[in-house]
Amino acid sequence: MSSVPAPREYFLDSIRAWLMLLGIPFHISLIYSTHSWHVNSATPSWWLTLFNDFIHAFRMQVFFVISGYFSYMLFLRYPLKRWWKVRVERVGIPMLTAIPLLTLPQFILLQYVKEKTENWPTLSAYEKYNTLAWELISHLWFLLVLVILTTVSIGIFTWFQKRQETSKPRPAAISLARLSLIFFLLGMAYAAIRRIIFIVYPAILSDGMFNFIVMQTLFYVPFFILGALAFIHPDLKARFTTPSRGCTLGAAVAFIAYLLNQRYGSGDAWMYETESVITMVMGLWMVNVVFSLGHRLLNFQSARVTYFVNASLFIYLVHHPLTLFFGAYITPHISSNLIGFLCGLIFVMGIALILYEIHLRIPLLKFLFSGKPPVKQESRAAIG
């Protein structure tokens, strides 16, 4: 355990918040894309589809790198049990809160919007369970994955810490080219695992909990570990914060490959396996692109930025049902996709900010949506 706090990483805080807030334009653009979603506009937009695909191709990979970075930083700061408790509470409590308050009402809304209420009694027990697993976890899936990664990383982080204590500090002698090869092989390994499952027991791939707990965790664990390694080895982090023309060009080529796979691939063939390889390496390259841009443009302290850093999780949690409400009841009345998209951003962001300010004034809600226990008045007085 370290008593010396690490210097504040303002650009990483900002990037993490922006990646979270990107969920709003991502889901609103999904309404106007060619992808089939819960709610869709009458006529899809090609450029909003392109915008949606771009966000989807890299956002969460970069997010999990930052999560791994901060997780290991806090691992060194707290005793093991306290670290696990704090990390799980910070993501687990908001997730468990959002299920009854947000995703359950969202599920009921969609049942009426899609006129599925009459079909519900005809579903088997497993079909009901699986439907609820997909719909109630919904956009909260990454919180569940973070709980799992936090638990799994106890052994990994302990091993990292022991190696730091017993061996002399040395540079992480690994280039971005070598990292790219490693992540390409990891993508191939993930694709092979998925293909074997598809051959042996394809039905399990449609199981919501299996998808979230096993498949999503397997895909994102390399990025989470990479974040921890970036904290351990400053020179590795420097590789990501230094602009790389190769990573930028590689990410552009990977995105084109991603689009071609979306356009010409088949789910019954190798589309999902190909996508996993592409997004694995594109995610790595976009870490360099996003970190280098963020380090240059966002590495400063600002009250406004801090506000959105603190608000980003709450806004992300509430934006999804607001987006679906907008898509179901307001989108049909707006003929222009561009105007609809902009109105959606204003509608969702405006209401989310109002709800955020309201919840700050209710201590119970503030705790439930942040996982942070209230600071006792005695502690505040002592600090002051």
UniProtKB/Swiss-Prot annotation:
<comment type="function">
    <text>Necessary for the succinyl substitution of periplasmic glucans. Could catalyze the transfer of succinyl residues from the cytoplasmic side of the membrane to the nascent glucan backbones on the periplasmic side of the membrane.</text>
</comment>
<dbReference type="InterPro" id="IPR023723">
    <property type="entry name" value="Glucans_biosynth_C"/>
</dbReference>
<feature type="transmembrane region" description="Helical">
    <location>
        <begin position="173"/>
        <end position="193"/>
    </location>
</feature>
<keyword id="KW-0012">Acyltransferase</keyword>
<keyword id="KW-0472">Membrane</keyword>
<protein>
    <recommendedName>
        <fullName>Glucans biosynthesis protein C</fullName>
        <ecNumber>2.1.-.-</ecNumber>
    </recommendedName>
</protein>
<feature type="transmembrane region" description="Helical">
    <location>
        <begin position="140"/>
        <end position="160"/>
    </location>
</feature>
<keyword id="KW-0808">Transferase</keyword>
<feature type="transmembrane region" description="Helical">
    <location>
        <begin position="212"/>
        <end position="232"/>
    </location>
</feature>
<keyword id="KW-1003">Cell membrane</keyword>
<dbReference type="InterPro" id="IPR002656">
    <property type="entry name" value="Acyl_transf_3_dom"/>
</dbReference>
<keyword id="KW-1133">Transmembrane helix</keyword>
<dbReference type="GO" id="GO:0005886">
    <property type="term" value="C:plasma membrane"/>
</dbReference>
<dbReference type="GO" id="GO:0009250">
    <property type="term" value="P:glucan biosynthetic process"/>
</dbReference>
<dbReference type="GO" id="GO:0016741">
    <property type="term" value="F:transferase activity, transferring one-carbon groups"/>
</dbReference>
<dbReference type="Pfam" id="PF01757">
    <property type="entry name" value="Acyl_transf_3"/>
</dbReference>
<dbReference type="GO" id="GO:0016747">
    <property type="term" value="F:acyltransferase activity, transferring groups other than amino-acyl groups"/>
</dbReference>
<feature type="transmembrane region" description="Helical">
    <location>
        <begin position="338"/>
        <end position="358"/>
    </location>
</feature>
<keyword id="KW-0812">Transmembrane</keyword>
<comment type="similarity">
    <text>Belongs to the acyltransferase 3 family. OpgC subfamily.</text>
</comment>
<feature type="transmembrane region" description="Helical">
    <location>
        <begin position="274"/>
        <end position="294"/>
    </location>
</feature>
<comment type="pathway">
    <text>Glycan metabolism; osmoregulated periplasmic glucan (OPG) biosynthesis.</text>
</comment>
<feature type="transmembrane region" description="Helical">
    <location>
        <begin position="54"/>
        <end position="74"/>
    </location>
</feature>
<feature type="transmembrane region" description="Helical">
    <location>
        <begin position="17"/>
        <end position="37"/>
    </location>
</feature>
<dbReference type="InterPro" id="IPR050623">
    <property type="entry name" value="Glucan_succinyl_AcylTrfase"/>
</dbReference>
<feature type="transmembrane region" description="Helical">
    <location>
        <begin position="311"/>
        <end position="331"/>
    </location>
</feature>
<feature type="transmembrane region" description="Helical">
    <location>
        <begin position="91"/>
        <end position="111"/>
    </location>
</feature>
<feature type="transmembrane region" description="Helical">
    <location>
        <begin position="240"/>
        <end position="260"/>
    </location>
</feature>
